């Protein structure tokens, strides 16, 4: 279940650090967060879709690793990002 191109482009434009940035940690985490939201909604309807559940757990793990990397290298940017995304209460 991939993101639509226009949705992905909008996320990139919102979270990019500079004009040509498409793959910074911030952008990657924002894209993964959107995919997690979509998969969570899918799994609310399709409770027995275990393949998607496994994919969701894999995506959550990838986002967790990226957030840990960002926290180690730039804690201030990490804090700003999680506030903007509304994750981790």
UniProtKB/Swiss-Prot annotation:
Entry-linked InterPro entries: Ribosomal_uS15, Ribosomal_uS15_bac-type, uS15_NS1_RNA-bd_sf
GO cellular component labels: cytosolic small ribosomal subunit
SUPFAM superfamilies reported for this sequence: S15/NS1 RNA-binding domain
Key words of the record: Ribonucleoprotein, Ribosomal protein, RNA-binding, rRNA-binding
Keyword Ribosomal protein on entry: yes
Keyword field contains Transferase: no
PROSITE patterns: RIBOSOMAL_S15
Gene Ontology biological process terms from the UniProt entry: translation
Record-level Gene Ontology MF annotations: rRNA binding; structural constituent of ribosome
UniProt cross-references to CDD domains, sorted A to Z: Ribosomal_S15p_S13e (cd00353)
Protein family according to the UniProt entry: Belongs to the universal ribosomal protein uS15 family.
HAMAP family: Ribosomal_uS15_B (MF_01343_B)
Role this protein plays: One of the primary rRNA binding proteins, it binds directly to 16S rRNA where it helps nucleate assembly of the platform of the 30S subunit by binding and bridging several RNA helices of the 16S rRNA. Forms an intersubunit bridge (bridge B4) with the 23S rRNA of the 50S subunit in the ribosome.
Assembly: Part of the 30S ribosomal subunit. Forms a bridge to the 50S subunit in the 70S ribosome, contacting the 23S rRNA.
NCBIfam families named among the record's database cross-references: S15_bact
Protein's name in the database: Small ribosomal subunit protein uS15
Species in which this protein is naturally found: Thermosynechococcus vestitus (strain NIES-2133 / IAM M-273 / BP-1)
């Amino acid at each position: 279940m991939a993101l639509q191109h226009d949705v992905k482009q909008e996320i990139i434009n919102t979270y990019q650090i500079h004009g040509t940035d498409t793959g910074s940690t911030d952008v990657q985490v924002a894209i993964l967060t959107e995919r997690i939201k979509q998969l969570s909604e899918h799994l609310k309807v399709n409770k027995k879709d275990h393949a998607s559940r496994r994919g969701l757990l894999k995506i959550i793990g990838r986002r967790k690793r990226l957030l840990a990397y960002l926290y180690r290298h730039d804690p201030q940017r990490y804090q700003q990002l999680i506030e903007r995304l509304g994750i981790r209460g």
